[in-house]
């Protein structure tokens, strides 16, 4: 036999290393034990028995063939509990860690530290190894002094229809172009799937903030001119502030130099763009002191210091951001997750909620119902229901138009529904218009949510056919902005015709 090649030597080393690891884990004995418990005999023993039987004298009576049995039956399928001696259900990295018993305590300590929520007030420069504190402050100071108060076949249909002059003008206004100074695959704001986006209200310079499913927050200082250096990268600052999904990002209604971000880990934190400090505003907990994931929040139109919030378990509460958190008064609006809510700008005491319980409900927050009949929870008060729409599948998003009293919702039934909410509402709410739309996501794409622009009766929603679609409140499509991937989580600039969408790999598509 000739000399082994380098590839063959490497392969033998891998086989030896894997065998050593399997010996440490004692998997051979475990495998034999599972076979015995499942009633499966070893194939080698079967062959030996057959050979021995063949060499003996002819049998007088032919034995019937045994009934076929499954080659393997797991304990889970047999309804048995795992006793700790079975083959561990782990991935390759975890398997290697198990084989390195001397380093397990340290690895466990690191994993525990990664899952520990960030508590108290912090400097972002302390969390970002690659950033100098002075450079970090200079980068965002320009955003700290701004005052701000609170269709897949589009082209084909456009050619067949004769729009009104008003619609034609809107279509021209929203014929937006994709930002091209950097390619979208270079604009990576977060490490994981984007779950929240926000367009800062500054007009002189653009700032886009995104949060992801791992609790990371990325701030993109958008460059307006071509860089002199071809190797220059987008100006993105990344920091990990939470341990779970970032559910919502906004600015304070009274101070746009302060950002506010909420997470599924129950934390509400601010980011001051002037000094780049992050302050812990609130940790939302239930009566058992367990964190309540914050799914959505919005500042009240009547009082810009009061925050309305909803939770992953169906509660609703209000909080004055000027005060220190004390006892939180929770009201139950659903027995399941509230994924989205919106405050009616014409009647700020009314809110609409979209829930996993397949309903859109409108509530009067001035009125309390101590024992709601619809809830299975006896100890929770609620608010009074004004109107309800029952959907075939869960309702993902709700959003009020700023001026003409239209409410939009979308969900997993691949529709966008528009409701007229002016005047007195019937208990059984029915849409004025239903649009078919490709908006049902899978597990790898964030939920698509229709969002009205703050200063116009125009809303946008991502399309699973890789685009952002823009509509009027009467359902007329104004634009179909194609993208390379699904820009699932969108955000409008509050005053300009700019929109941004974030995808499942942490990247952003900006249209201006």
Curated annotation (Swiss-Prot):
Residues 32-96 are annotated as: Disordered. InterPro entries: WD40/YVTN_repeat-like_dom_sf, WD40_repeat_CS, WD40_repeat_dom_sf, WD40_rpt, WD_repeat_DNA-damage-binding. Disulfide bonds: none annotated. It comes from the Eukaryota. One of its GO terms (cellular component) is nucleus. One of its GO terms (molecular function) is DNA binding. WD repeats lie at residues 189-230, 241-281, 289-329, 333-373, 390-429, 442-481, 482-512. SUPFAM superfamilies: WD40 repeat-like. It holds the Pfam family WD40. Residues 34-46 have a biased composition (Basic and acidic residues). Keywords: DNA damage, DNA-binding, Repeat, WD repeat. GO terms for biological process: DNA damage response; regulation of DNA damage checkpoint. Residues 47-60 have a biased composition (Basic residues). Belongs to the WD repeat DDB2/WDR76 family. DNA-binding protein that binds to both single- and double-stranded DNA. Binds preferentially to UV-damaged DNA. May be involved in DNA-metabolic processes. This is DNA damage-binding protein CMR1.
């Amino acid at each position: 036999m000739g000399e082994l090649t380098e590839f063959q030597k490497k392969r033998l080393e891998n086989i030896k290393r894997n065998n050593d690891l399997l010996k440490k884990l004692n998997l051979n004995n475990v495998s034999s034990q599972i076979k015995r418990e499942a009633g499966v005999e070893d194939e080698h023993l079967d062959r030996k028995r057959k050979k021995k039987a063949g060499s003996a004298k002819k049998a007088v009576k032919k034995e019937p063939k045994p009934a076929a049995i499954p080659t393997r039956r797991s304990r889970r399928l047999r309804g048995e509990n795992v006793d700790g001696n079975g083959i561990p259900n782990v991935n390759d990295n975890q398997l290697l860690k198990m084989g390195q018993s001397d380093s397990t305590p340290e690895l466990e300590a690191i994993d525990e530290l990664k899952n520990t929520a960030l508590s108290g007030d912090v400097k972002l420069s302390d969390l970002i190894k690659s950033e100098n504190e002075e450079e970090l402050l200079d980068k965002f100071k320009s955003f700290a002094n701004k005052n701000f108060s609170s269709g897949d076949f589009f082209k084909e249909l456009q050619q067949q229809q004769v729009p009104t002059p008003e619609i034609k003008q809107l279509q021209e206004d929203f014929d937006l172009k994709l930002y091209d100074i950097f390619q979208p695959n270079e604009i990576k704001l977060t490490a994981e799937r984007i779950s929240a986006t926000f367009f800062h209200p500054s007009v002189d310079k653009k700032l886009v903030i995104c949060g992801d499913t791992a609790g990371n927050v990325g701030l993109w200082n958008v460059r307006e001119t071509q860089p002199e250096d071809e190797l220059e990268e987008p100006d993105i600052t990344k920091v990990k502030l939470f341990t779970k999904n970032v559910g919502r990002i906004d600015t304070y209604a009274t101070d746009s130099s302060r950002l506010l971000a909420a997470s599924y880990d129950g934390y509400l934190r601010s980011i001051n763009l002037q000094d780049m400090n992050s302050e812990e505003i609130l940790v939302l907990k239930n009566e058992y002191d367990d964190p309540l994931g914050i799914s959505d929040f919005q500042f009240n139109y009547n009082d810009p210091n009061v925050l309305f919030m909803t939770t992953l378990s169906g509660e609703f509460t209000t909080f004055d951001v000027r005060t220190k958190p004390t006892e939180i008064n929770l009201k139950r609006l659903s027995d399941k997750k509230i994924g989205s809510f919106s405050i009616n700008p014409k009647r700020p005491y009314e809110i609409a909620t979209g829930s996993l319980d397949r309903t859109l409900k409108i509530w009067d927050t001035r009125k309390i119902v101590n024992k709601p009949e619809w809830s299975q929870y006896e100890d929770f008060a609620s608010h009074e229901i004004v109107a309800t729409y029952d959907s075939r599948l869960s309702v993902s998003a709700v959003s009020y138009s700023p001026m003409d009293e239209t409410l939009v919702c979308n969900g997993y039934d691949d529709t966008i529904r528009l409701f007229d909410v002016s005047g007195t509402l019937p208990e059984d709410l029915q849409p004025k218009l239903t649009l078919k739309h490709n908006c049902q996501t899978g597990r790898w794409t964030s939920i698509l949510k229709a969002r009205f622009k703050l200063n116009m009766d125009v809303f946008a929603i991502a399309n699973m056919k890789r685009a952002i679609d823009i509509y009027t409140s009467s359902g007329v499509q104004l634009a179909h902005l194609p993208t390379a991937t699904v820009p699932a989580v969108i955000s409008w600039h509050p005053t300009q015709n700019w929109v941004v969408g974030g995808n499942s790999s942490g990247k952003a598509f900006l249209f201006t």
